[in-house]
């Protein structure tokens, strides 16, 4: 019998256990969430009620008709056409585990492949208890009380001090063999457990390097250590050449996307396990990974003995593949036995986000303060244009608690900190507070304002790994000296961009700006002319940041 028919025959065997919808027992359906999985239902048969409005793009579904139990029940029901996004009753049948869950695009959901899983389920159209009794269709939009179902807030879990999106690239070649492959998986499981995986902590995925690289699961598939450990256990040994370079390049290019669970502003990390030495060139893959902003760690096990060195393409493969050749990104274990003592030091490295040099870009590793002129000559309508200018710059950057940070000070003769670098850690909150800034009105003392900002805004973050920038926007001449305070700011490592409008003297703008003055000082006659300067400021910040990294 052709092998291609085997899944159909298996499904036929499963189907013999599955009664039609009319065979229900009249039980009241259990209300579940959009993301309740098959493994969360511990019954051979269950009637559930999927809510309306589940986001299709966030469903995690593995297989077709028969789904891995790690799949979303409601996602599987929509995928199979049992319900629409309006929700409704679904009957769930538990099935044995299997191999080769297929990927099928159906009803707006692209299910994913999975090599193997320990349990499965299938779904059919269910009936509510009212339908069972009367045969009448009933609405599932509201419960019988007429009140809306309360959405259960997602519990925030994980180690908040360890923010990273991590791909474990394990060795699945014949070189490592089945026994050491299992020891390798045990070690990866221990690392995953200690990381503190969760919605607020690190997210992890797994790629196996063999003849052809295979992504076993993505960042978005599991957000608890328990599920990750189970998924690692289920990964099967593939064999073939290690082709680590090919696998690393594939991981850097394909693994980290928004669709697969990558989070903005979070360091991207690949931990490469190499048993012995790679069978292909790994240097080029390291270059590609760095270009994609990926921090590559190499965990090497059992270095080649002198007699084997002739078979190694490049004995310096570790130094050429890691993010930086500074010792931080390389890690060695003598063998796969007694590896528990190596877990904690590796976890500490993976959680040191300030050391993730390859993740640092001008968009996620800068502190930018805006010094905004609130003097009487500006006027309320023009002040709004200044705030729009500030917002358009700020929204370009990847603002987060470990990424770019924004602050704002308004000045007249006095100074007012509108918000500091540590007040807001999301782009949405930063943009909202910028819009809410109230116009002060008064005189113009720019020099005092610079000194105030250096002391009170940049002072608390003087030890930050981010590069510091100050953008000054003013429309007139300062009543005090600007040269001295600006020089002090430069000496403190703060790069200044000065933006003048209307009556702002060019000499003051140049005195405040960092060198070269021509690329750090800007002027426009009208407040409506601020908009074209936005891109100049952003390019300038990125240019200065890159120069500081060399």
From Swiss-Prot:
S-S bridge residues: 34-50, 54-74
Pfam families for the chain: LCCL, VWA
Domain LCCL: 28-121
GO cellular component, one term: extracellular region
PTM entry text: N-glycosylated.
Subcellular location as annotated: Secreted, Extracellular space, Extracellular matrix
Residue ranges, annotated region (Disordered): 126-158
Entries under CDD domains matching the protein: vWA_collagen, vWA_collagen_alphaI-XII-like
Keywords, in A-Z order: Disulfide bond, Extracellular matrix, Glycoprotein, Repeat, Secreted, Signal
Domain of life, per lineage: Eukaryota
Signal peptide (from-to): 1-15
Biased segments, Polar residues type: 126-139
UniProt cross-references to SUPFAM superfamilies, sorted A to Z: LCCL domain, vWA-like
The VWFA domain, residue ranges: 165-350, 367-537
Glycosylation sites (chain numbering): 100
Record carries keyword Cell division: no
A Gene Ontology molecular function term of the record: collagen binding
Main location per the UniProt record: secreted
Disulfide bond recorded as keyword: yes
Binding partners and assembly: Monomer. May form homodimer. Interacts with type II collagen. Interacts with ANXA2. Interacts with SLC44A2.
Job of this protein: Plays a role in the control of cell shape and motility in the trabecular meshwork.
Protein name in the entry: Cochlin
């Amino acid at each position: 019998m052709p092998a291609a028919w085997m899944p159909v025959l298996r499904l036929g065997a499963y189907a013999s256990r599955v009664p039609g919808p009319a065979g229900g027992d009249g039980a009241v359906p259990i209300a579940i969430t959009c993301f309740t999985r098959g493994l969360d239902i511990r019954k051979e048969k269950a009637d559930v009620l999927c809510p309306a409005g589940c986001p299709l793009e966030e469903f995690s579904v593995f297989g077709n008709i028969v789904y891995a139990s790690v799949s979303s029940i409601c996602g599987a029901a929509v995928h199979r056409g049992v319900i629409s996004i309006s929700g409704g009753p679904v009957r769930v049948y538990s099935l044995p585990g299997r191999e080769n869950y297929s990927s099928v695009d159906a009803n707006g959901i692209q299910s994913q492949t999975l090599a193997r899983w320990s349990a499965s389920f299938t779904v059919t159209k269910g009936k509510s208890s009212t339908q069972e009794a009367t045969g009448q269709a009933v609405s599932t939009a509201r419960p019988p009380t007429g009140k809306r179902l309360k959405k259960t807030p997602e519990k925030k879990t994980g180690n908040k001090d360890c923010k990273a999106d991590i791909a474990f690239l394990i060795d699945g070649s014949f070189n490592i063999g089945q026994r050491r492959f299992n020891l390798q998986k045990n070690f990866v499981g221990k690392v995953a457990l200690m990381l503190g995986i969760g919605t607020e902590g690190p997210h992890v995925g797994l790629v196996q390097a063999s003849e052809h690289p295979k992504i076993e699961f993505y960042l978005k598939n599991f957000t608890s250590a328990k599920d990750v450990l189970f998924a690692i256990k289920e990964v099967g040994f593939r064999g073939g050449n290690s082709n680590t370079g090919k696998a690393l390049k594939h991981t850097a290019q394909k693994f980290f996307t928004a669709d697969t669970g990558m989070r903005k502003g979070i360091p991207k990390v690949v931990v490469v396990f190499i048993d012995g030495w790679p069978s292909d060139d790994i240097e080029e893959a390291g270059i590609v990974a760095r270009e994609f902003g990926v921090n590559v760690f190499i965990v090497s096990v059992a270095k080649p003995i002198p007699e084997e060195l002739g078979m190694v393409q490049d004995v310096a493969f570790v130094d050429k593949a890691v993010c930086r050749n500074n010792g931080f990104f390389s890690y060695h274990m003598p063998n796969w036995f007694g590896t528990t003592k190596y877990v904690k030091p590796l976890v500490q490295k993976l959680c040191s986000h300030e050391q993730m040099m390859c993740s640092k870009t001008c968009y996620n590793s800068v502190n930018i303060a805006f010094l905004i002129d609130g003097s009487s000559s500006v006027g309320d309508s023009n002040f709004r244009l200044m705030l729009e200018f500030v917002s358009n710059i700020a929204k370009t950057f990847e603002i987060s608690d470990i990424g770019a940070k924004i602050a704002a000070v308004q000045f007249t003769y006095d100074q007012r900190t509108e918000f500091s670098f540590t007040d807001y850690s999301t782009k949405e909150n930063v943009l909202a507070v910028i819009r809410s800034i109230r116009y002060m009105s008064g005189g113009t003392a720019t020099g005092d304002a610079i000194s105030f900002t250096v002391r009170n805004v940049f002072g608390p973050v003087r030890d930050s790994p981010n590069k510091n920038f100050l953008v000054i926007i003013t429309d007139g001449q300062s009543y005090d000296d600007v040269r001295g305070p600006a020089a002090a700011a430069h000496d403190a490592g703060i790069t200044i961009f000065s933006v003048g409008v209307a009556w702002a003297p060019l000499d003051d703008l140049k005195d405040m700006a960092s060198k070269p003055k021509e690329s750090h000082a800007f002027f426009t006659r009208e407040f409506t002319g601020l908009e074209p300067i936005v891109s100049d400021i952003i390019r300038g910040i990125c240019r200065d940041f890159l120069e500081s990294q060399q």
